[in-house]
Amino acid sequence: MQITRVLLLPFSLLALCGSAQTLSITHARVIDTITGQIRRDTTVVIDGNRIARIDPSSKSVPKAAKIINAHGQYLIPGLWDMHTHVYFDRTAADGDDLILPLFIANGITGIRDMGSKLDAVLNARDGVASHRLFGPRMIVSGPMLDGPKSQYKAAIPITTPEDGRKAVDLLKNRGVNFIKVQSGVPREAYFAIADESKRVGIPFEGHVPDAIRASEAISSGQRTFEHLIGIFEASSPDETGYLTGKKSPGLFLASYDPAREATIIELLAKQHVWQCPTLYWERGQWLVDVIDYSKDPDLAYAAHTWVDKLWPQSQQSILKSLDTDPVAIRERFVSHELDVVRKLHTAGVPFLAGTDTPAGVDVIPGISLHLELQRFVAAGFTPLQALQTATLNPAQFYNKLDEYGTIQAGRLADLLLLKANPLTDIANTRSITAVIADGRYLSQGDLNRLRSRLRRSAVMK
């Protein structure tokens, strides 16, 4: 019976949100994610999965519309998590039944998946698009390209340049949206991957591999840097040694050179290389022995196998790699990361909000994106700028400003209603009263029922 309940969950969730319809959200406070201005007492009319028009609430609404009175509430675009691994190393059912619905339950209506099993993630992307599966819009890489000794199940091991070219061709032909490179890709294979990606017309993004300088990744056309990898190495006179040697927070801090840091920041800004720093995940990695996830108030949404097995295993594995750096050094490095993000932002380097969920300890899908926005504010972003990393910026990154990222007529109807203003406190992005995903409306009651089902699903995983 337990198996039957799990398998039936996606179908019951689809029934929960119904289909797109004509909606009129009246008396809302609509936040402009470009300027930060708020249009008060505004009606947003949705027809199907598109915003049809935006008017003062004094104007009449379509007679057939379902009316949602949003008096006193704030309307923002749906959020994007730009670094996820939905089908990373467990069964497809975990992604279908728990991870994807958790995104919607927390207002994440779009994700960039940075490494998952190929068939599972392609099926999910297409299933969500056709409303056969309950979840956010998905931009996917399929499996990562990693080195010959990759530890990941959702990776293609690469040894030679020819391996790299073949992998790019395979993934391009299967229909992935971009290529993800991991840290272990060998040097010559990396350049082959970059060259082949350009040749076949597919973006490549991800880690700056251990064998590659940040400047080389930039000149090769790598579109994003994840986790700030490459920047710390480039900020040190020991950068060449880091290509083949050990790295650690203590070593990075000891060899830090502000002038070299300024040089790499200037280059990143000039070439407009997007950064997805995963700050919440980073803090959890470096302080894994300090943070007590058992006290997380949202722990009920984490699969019990994550909590009981995977997270303790990850803790031990991470601690083994950190045994030479005391907590005080690692705390300094976490602060240093925030300072680097502040400098990058001041220089005009563009940012995307991402979490690496469900990889990492206590990085719960959906919930962690809100915590990531709070880390951006801790790094010196205004609440509006932090909000932009999960709304406006993903749309700019994909050249889709005509589709999402703002609330305007003609845009896709991916929206959140909030009780409180996120521009005064970014934590208010969690005060969700309704989610509209591809035109499908989930009320507060629907969300409460969804979250209850997901807590039950987490127990069974």
Residue ranges and their predicted role:
Residues 30-43, 56-57, 335, 364, ...:
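Acidic, glycine-enriched loop/beta-strand segments at the rims
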Residues 99-119, 135-143, 170-185, 202-205, ...:
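Divalent metal-dependent hydrolysis catalytic cores, especially in the metallo-beta-lactamase
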Residues 170-185, 231-379, 455-461:
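Active-site neighborhoods of metal-dependent hydrolases
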Residues 28, 44, 49, 72, ...:
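Divalent metal-coordination and catalytic microenvironments
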